[in-house]
Amino acid sequence: MIEKAISRRIKEFRQLGEKGEVEFDFRPFLDFSVKATIRTELAFCISTANSSATAGLKFQRLLGQGVGVKEALTLAGVRFHNRKAEYIREAFKSFKLVEKALEAESSKAREILLKIKGLGMKEASHFLRNVGREDVAIIDRHILRWLERQGYEVPGTMTAKKYLEVEKILMEISEERGESLAEMDLRIWAEMTGKVLK
């Protein structure tokens, strides 16, 4: 079940990046699907910072149904909804930067995305992974806990420099395992949470 869900999710990520839209199916982990565009995926990645993936998915679904950004964030139970609404509106205004990033290779794309208010290393990497990039790591608390369990020392504070150092470790592990960072991230997340989301 987990392997099949990971494979399906990777295909959905690629489709979103190639065609600009996709319907993510989260069954059997959550009993709903979410239609996504590049724009709503960017909003989703901003919404999930310091909030739950499930709240972010509910937000994205509401956004796709035509509910306004701030109202959708509030209804979905996303933490810090006022600040995130501002970040998402600014990101939508800066969408030319997103388009430019999507034309660049992953490390350059992430640098470009970091110019958008509300996107840090994790959020920019999350967005890139979710549009089909398989060579960036989303370093969240689940990944850090997993690394600690594997005997790695993890930083207490995540600067951009430390993010890249941890990403390099994850890249080495993924190469040893014969899988992409995107696949490994989903597998670790499933191990830590019991779910394959995004």
From Swiss-Prot:
Optimum temperature is 60 degrees Celsius. Its EC number is 3.2.2.-, 4.2.99.18. It comes from the Archaea. SMART domains: ENDO3c. The record marks 198 as: Important for guanine/8-oxoguanine distinction. One of its GO terms (biological process) is base-excision repair. Keywords: DNA damage, DNA repair, Glycosidase, Hydrolase, Lyase, Multifunctional enzyme. Pfam families: Ogg-HhH. InterPro entries: DNA_glyclase/AP_lyase_Ogg, DNA_glycosylase, HhH-GPD_domain, HhH_base_excis_C. The active site is at 122, 140. It catalyses: 2'-deoxyribonucleotide-(2'-deoxyribose 5'-phosphate)-2'-deoxyribonucleotide-DNA = a 3'-end 2'-deoxyribonucleotide-(2,3-dehydro-2,3-deoxyribose 5'-phosphate)-DNA + a 5'-end 5'-phospho-2'-deoxyribonucleoside-DNA + H(+). Transmembrane segments: none annotated. Optimum pH is 8.5. NCBIfam families: PRK01229.1. Monomer. Catalyzes the excision of an oxidatively damaged form of guanine (7,8-dihydro-8-oxoguanine = 8-oxoG) from DNA. Also cleaves the DNA backbone at apurinic/apyrimidinic sites (AP sites). Efficiently cleaves oligomers containing 8-oxoG:C and 8-oxoG:G base pairs, and is less effective on oligomers containing 8-oxoG:T and 8-oxoG:A mispairs. This is 8-oxoguanine DNA glycosylase/AP lyase. It comes from Archaeoglobus fulgidus (strain ATCC 49558 / DSM 4304 / JCM 9628 / NBRC 100126 / VC-16). The lineage of its organism: Archaea, Methanobacteriati, Methanobacteriota, Archaeoglobi, Archaeoglobales.
